[in-house]
Amino acid sequence: MKHLWFFLLLVAAPRWVLSQVQLQESGPGLVKPSETLSLTCTVSGGSISSYYWSWIRQPPGKGLEWIGYIYYSGSTNYNPSLKSRVTISVDTSKNQFSLKLSSVTAADTAVYYCAR
């Protein structure tokens, strides 16, 4: 079965914007078609509380696409075009938030970013 590659990057916002806050993604580098992509973003240098946390992606040769965001309290908002396949969750005890994208296809191949 053909594999899809998903590239993970460290996303560190400029210090003058987020002070010492850094975001580190983790997850598998590849997912098979029809499977679920699961990524986790760990927030360090600050608390996950009181902010909105987002997932975005950039397909090869294309612009950025917003996937969705979650507030530290757990409320979410998703891109309507992905809503049926996306779940974003937060774990304040671990200072982490996560993305699950189900039923992946070749169209989901992209660089995935977490951001505040």
Swiss-Prot record:
Complementarity-determining-2: annotated span: 70-76
Chief site of localization: secreted
Key words of the record: Adaptive immunity, Cell membrane, Disulfide bond, Immunity, Immunoglobulin, Immunoglobulin domain, Membrane, Pyrrolidone carboxylic acid, Secreted, Signal
GO BP terms in the entry: immune response; immunoglobulin mediated immune response
Region (Framework-3): 77-114
Nuclease as UniProt keyword: no
Pfam families: V-set
Region named Complementarity-determining-3: 115-116
UniProt-annotated stretches for the region Framework-1: 20-44
Lineage: superkingdom: Eukaryota
An example Gene Ontology molecular-function term: antigen binding
The keyword Secreted appears for this protein: yes
Stretch list, region Framework-2: 53-69
Signal peptide: 1-19
Role this protein plays: V region of the variable domain of immunoglobulin heavy chains that participates in the antigen recognition. Immunoglobulins, also known as antibodies, are membrane-bound or secreted glycoproteins produced by B lymphocytes. In the recognition phase of humoral immunity, the membrane-bound immunoglobulins serve as receptors which, upon binding of a specific antigen, trigger the clonal expansion and differentiation of B lymphocytes into immunoglobulins-secreting plasma cells.
Subunit structure: Immunoglobulins are composed of two identical heavy chains and two identical light chains; disulfide-linked.
Name of the protein this chain belongs to: Immunoglobulin heavy variable 4-59
Gene: IGHV4-59
